[in-house]
Protein backbone atom coordinates (compact mmCIF):
# COMPACT_ATOMS: atom_id res chain seq x y z
CA UNK A 1 0.00 0.00 0.00
CA UNK A 2 0.88 3.55 0.68
CA UNK A 3 2.83 2.86 3.84
CA UNK A 4 6.48 3.82 3.68
CA UNK A 5 8.14 6.84 2.15
CA UNK A 6 9.82 4.84 -0.63
CA UNK A 7 6.45 3.78 -2.04
CA UNK A 8 5.07 7.34 -1.92
CA UNK A 9 8.17 8.77 -3.61
CA UNK A 10 7.99 6.13 -6.34
CA UNK A 11 4.28 6.81 -6.89
CA UNK A 12 4.83 10.58 -7.19
CA UNK A 13 7.75 10.03 -9.54
CA UNK A 14 5.68 7.80 -11.85
CA UNK A 15 2.86 10.33 -11.87
CA UNK A 16 5.24 13.28 -12.35
CA UNK A 17 6.87 11.62 -15.36
CA UNK A 18 3.46 11.03 -16.95
CA UNK A 19 1.58 14.32 -16.51
CA UNK A 20 -0.48 15.62 -18.06
CA UNK A 21 -2.23 12.40 -18.85
CA UNK A 22 -5.70 10.97 -19.26
CA UNK A 23 -5.89 8.66 -16.26
CA UNK A 24 -6.78 5.01 -16.52
CA UNK A 25 -7.01 4.00 -12.88
CA UNK A 26 -6.97 0.29 -13.72
CA UNK A 27 -3.68 0.58 -15.65
CA UNK A 28 -2.22 2.84 -12.95
CA UNK A 29 -3.19 0.28 -10.31
CA UNK A 30 -1.32 -2.42 -12.21
CA UNK A 31 1.72 -0.18 -12.74
CA UNK A 32 1.82 0.82 -9.07
CA UNK A 33 0.89 -2.67 -7.83
CA UNK A 34 -2.16 -1.36 -5.97
CA UNK A 35 -5.90 -1.80 -5.81
CA UNK A 36 -7.81 0.45 -8.26
CA UNK A 37 -9.74 2.13 -5.44
CA UNK A 38 -6.46 2.84 -3.64
CA UNK A 39 -5.18 4.60 -6.76
CA UNK A 40 -8.34 6.70 -6.91
CA UNK A 41 -7.86 7.61 -3.23
CA UNK A 42 -4.17 8.35 -3.82
CA UNK A 43 -5.04 10.76 -6.62
CA UNK A 44 -7.49 12.58 -4.36
CA UNK A 45 -4.88 12.78 -1.59
CA UNK A 46 -2.26 14.08 -4.02
CA UNK A 47 -4.72 16.74 -5.19
CA UNK A 48 -5.60 17.79 -1.63
CA UNK A 49 -1.88 17.93 -0.79
CA UNK A 50 -1.24 20.30 -3.69
CA UNK A 51 0.84 17.85 -5.75
CA UNK A 52 -1.56 17.39 -8.68
CA UNK A 53 -4.67 18.97 -10.19
CA UNK A 54 -7.36 16.82 -11.77
CA UNK A 55 -9.14 18.31 -14.78
CA UNK A 56 -12.71 17.14 -15.04
CA UNK A 57 -15.45 17.30 -17.65
CA UNK A 58 -18.30 19.71 -17.10
CA UNK A 59 -20.78 17.22 -15.66
CA UNK A 60 -23.07 17.22 -12.69
CA UNK A 61 -24.07 14.84 -9.94
CA UNK A 62 -22.55 11.43 -9.28
CA UNK A 63 -20.83 11.24 -12.71
CA UNK A 64 -18.58 14.15 -11.70
CA UNK A 65 -17.15 12.20 -8.78
CA UNK A 66 -15.40 9.58 -10.86
CA UNK A 67 -14.69 11.33 -14.15
CA UNK A 68 -11.18 12.75 -14.36
CA UNK A 69 -10.20 13.68 -17.92
CA UNK A 70 -6.62 14.76 -17.34
CA UNK A 71 -4.10 14.97 -14.50
CA UNK A 72 -1.60 17.83 -14.22
CA UNK A 73 1.03 18.66 -11.65
CA UNK A 74 -0.13 21.42 -9.30
CA UNK A 75 2.37 23.93 -10.65
CA UNK A 76 5.21 24.26 -13.11
CA UNK A 77 7.90 24.19 -10.41
CA UNK A 78 7.00 20.58 -9.64
CA UNK A 79 7.44 19.66 -13.31
CA UNK A 80 11.04 20.85 -13.19
CA UNK A 81 11.76 19.46 -9.71
CA UNK A 82 10.43 15.96 -10.39
CA UNK A 83 11.72 15.48 -13.94
CA UNK A 84 15.06 14.02 -14.99
CA UNK A 85 15.05 16.13 -18.15
CA UNK A 86 13.57 19.46 -19.10
CA UNK A 87 9.77 19.01 -19.05
CA UNK A 88 7.84 19.27 -22.30
CA UNK A 89 7.14 22.98 -22.85
CA UNK A 90 3.58 22.28 -24.01
CA UNK A 91 2.86 20.52 -20.72
CA UNK A 92 4.43 23.40 -18.79
CA UNK A 93 2.22 25.92 -20.62
CA UNK A 94 -0.96 23.94 -19.94
CA UNK A 95 0.02 23.40 -16.31
CA UNK A 96 0.62 27.14 -15.84
CA UNK A 97 -2.71 28.07 -17.42
CA UNK A 98 -4.70 25.48 -15.47
CA UNK A 99 -3.02 26.13 -12.12
CA UNK A 100 -3.50 29.91 -12.33
CA UNK A 101 -7.12 29.87 -13.49
CA UNK A 102 -8.39 27.12 -11.21
CA UNK A 103 -7.90 29.30 -8.11
CA UNK A 104 -10.33 31.95 -9.41
CA UNK A 105 -12.93 29.91 -11.32
CA UNK A 106 -13.87 26.36 -12.31
CA UNK A 107 -11.84 24.97 -15.23
CA UNK A 108 -13.12 21.99 -17.21
CA UNK A 109 -12.13 20.08 -20.32
CA UNK A 110 -13.12 21.20 -23.79
CA UNK A 111 -14.17 18.93 -26.64
CA UNK A 112 -12.35 21.09 -29.21
CA UNK A 113 -9.49 22.71 -27.30
CA UNK A 114 -7.54 22.43 -24.05
CA UNK A 115 -9.85 24.07 -21.51
CA UNK A 116 -13.29 25.59 -20.93
CA UNK A 117 -13.69 28.36 -18.37
CA UNK A 118 -17.11 29.91 -17.76
CA UNK A 119 -18.36 29.36 -21.31
CA UNK A 120 -15.08 30.42 -22.93
CA UNK A 121 -12.83 28.00 -24.78
CA UNK A 122 -9.04 28.22 -24.54
CA UNK A 123 -6.35 26.57 -26.64
CA UNK A 124 -2.85 26.95 -25.15
CA UNK A 125 0.30 26.91 -27.27
CA UNK A 126 3.50 28.61 -28.36
CA UNK A 127 3.82 31.83 -30.35
CA UNK A 128 3.20 29.98 -33.62
CA UNK A 129 -0.04 28.32 -32.45
CA UNK A 130 -2.67 28.78 -35.17
CA UNK A 131 -6.36 29.62 -34.85
CA UNK A 132 -7.32 26.48 -36.81
CA UNK A 133 -8.43 24.41 -33.83
CA UNK A 134 -10.85 27.05 -32.49
CA UNK A 135 -11.59 28.98 -35.69
CA UNK A 136 -15.32 28.16 -35.76
CA UNK A 137 -15.83 28.05 -31.99
CA UNK A 138 -17.77 30.90 -30.38
CA UNK A 139 -16.04 32.63 -27.45
CA UNK A 140 -12.74 30.89 -28.17
CA UNK A 141 -9.27 32.22 -27.42
CA UNK A 142 -5.78 31.11 -28.29
CA UNK A 143 -3.38 31.57 -25.38
CA UNK A 144 0.17 31.96 -26.69
CA UNK A 145 3.49 31.76 -24.93
CA UNK A 146 6.45 33.90 -26.02
CA UNK A 147 4.38 36.88 -27.18
CA UNK A 148 4.33 40.32 -25.56
CA UNK A 149 0.76 41.41 -26.27
CA UNK A 150 -2.47 39.98 -27.58
CA UNK A 151 -4.89 40.97 -30.29
CA UNK A 152 -8.52 39.99 -30.92
CA UNK A 153 -8.85 36.45 -29.58
CA UNK A 154 -5.13 35.91 -28.87
CA UNK A 155 -4.00 36.38 -25.27
CA UNK A 156 -0.42 36.15 -23.98
CA UNK A 157 0.07 33.30 -21.52
CA UNK A 158 1.92 35.53 -19.06
CA UNK A 159 -1.20 37.70 -18.59
CA UNK A 160 -2.94 34.86 -16.75
CA UNK A 161 -0.25 35.05 -14.07
CA UNK A 162 -1.91 38.23 -12.81
CA UNK A 163 -4.96 36.21 -11.78
CA UNK A 164 -3.08 34.18 -9.22
Indicate where each model-derived feature is located:
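Accessory nucleic acid-recognition modules appended to NTPase machines
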Residues: 1, 5-6, 10-113
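Short, structured coil segments at secondary-structure junctions
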Residues: 3, 117, 136-138
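Structural signal for conserved beta-strand scaffold positions within catalytic alpha/beta enzyme cores
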Residues: 53-54, 73, 123, 142-144
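Conserved catalytic cores of phosphodiester-cleaving nucleases, focusing on short active-site segments
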Residues: 97, 101, 115-130
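Catalytic cores of nucleic-acid endonucleases
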Residues: 105, 110-112, 125-164
Amino acid sequence: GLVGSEMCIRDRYIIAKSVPFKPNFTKLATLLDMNRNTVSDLMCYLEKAGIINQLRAETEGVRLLGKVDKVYLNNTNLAYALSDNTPDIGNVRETFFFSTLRVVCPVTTSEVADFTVGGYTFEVGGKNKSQKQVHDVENAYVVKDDIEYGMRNVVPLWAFGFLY
